[in-house]
């Protein structure tokens, strides 16, 4: 086995070890646990690979594979809502960005949020949560820091088409704002399979526009912001009560004409104004 394959296997094993650790919280009706919690707790973890890395801010950061791990935990407070915390790690699997950051675990992102699910009927409810997002950028060679941001998300869940929006606003830079809006429609063709097709837009701020694409006298979209469209789907196949295989396909396209024009003039990763990204992984829920 080559050193690269060994490194990839270690990253995947690390994510699965985290999932196994979280499984200690899983309820087993046949066994009596040595501790108890005052409220129901659920969560999970997933380790996966993607063919490229598309930033949540709406830009293509890599065109080579990356390894990612994510874990989350949710405390159900009953009539008082719920608490949610999650964390995400990313590692590059190639030298495409060695000049920017190290390869293994170069970035961590986590959130701590409070949420409330307002039910209108059994099938229609408004799920809202918000809190703080924290980034650790210690793996970057020239951009060390721990930015803090406001993070909020809302879904109007219903049987037909679920609209949603998501806001990220950094405290250290009032211009650094990202807004995602979209619609999705989860469905299950069979009991063990869940598919969520979606389409969304990502509105980026003027500061990131200039940093990624450069200055242009022609941009007029939202005072210099840019917009990216994303369409795709997420699929899960649950092969045991708790374990599942995960797959994601995304196709992004830069909408703003000024951004498309500037991107095509640059000999960088972001010169791609349209790109397809595939992801495959293994997850666990409790």
Question: Model-flagged regions — what are they?
Answer:
Residues 81-182, 189, 218, 257, ...:
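Outer-membrane pore/translocation modules
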Residues 14-15, 43-44, 81, 87, ...:
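Small side chains
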Residues 1-42:
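Cleavable N-terminal export/targeting peptides
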């Amino acid at each position: 086995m080559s050193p690269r394959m060994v490194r990839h296997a270690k990253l995947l094993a690390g994510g699965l070890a985290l999932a196994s650790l979280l499984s200690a919280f899983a309820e087993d009706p046949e066994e009596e646990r040595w501790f108890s919690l005052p409220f129901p707790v659920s969560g999970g973890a997933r380790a996966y690979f993607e063919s490229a890395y598309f930033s949540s801010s709406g830009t293509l950061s890599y065109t080579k594979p990356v390894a990612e791990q994510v874990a989350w935990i949710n405390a159900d407070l009953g009539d008082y809502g719920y608490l949610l915390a999650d964390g995400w790690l990313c590692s590059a699997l190639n030298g495409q960005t060695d000049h920017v950051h190290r390869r293994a675990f170069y970035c961590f992102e986590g959130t701590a949020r409070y949420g409330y699910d307002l039910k209108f009927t059994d099938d229609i409810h408004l799920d809202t949560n918000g809190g703080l997002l924290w980034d650790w950028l210690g793996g970057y060679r020239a951009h060390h820091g721990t930015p803090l941001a406001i993070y909020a998300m809302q879904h109007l869940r219903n049987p037909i088409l679920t609209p949603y929006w998501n806001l990220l606003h950094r405290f250290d830079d009032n211009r650094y704002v990202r807004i995602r809006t979209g619609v999705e429609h989860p469905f299950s063709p069979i009991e063990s399979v869940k598919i969520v097709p979606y389409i969304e837009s990502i509105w980026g701020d003027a500061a990131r526009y200039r940093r990624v694409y450069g200055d242009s006298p022609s941009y007029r979209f939202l005072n210099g912001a840019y917009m990216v469209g994303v369409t795709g789907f997420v699929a899960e196949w649950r092969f045991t009560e708790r374990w599942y295989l995960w797959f994601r396909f995304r196709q992004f396209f830069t909408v703003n004409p000024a951004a498309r024009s500037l991107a095509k003039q640059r000999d960088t990763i972001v010169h791609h104004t349209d790109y397809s990204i595939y992801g495959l992984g293994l997850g666990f829920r409790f």
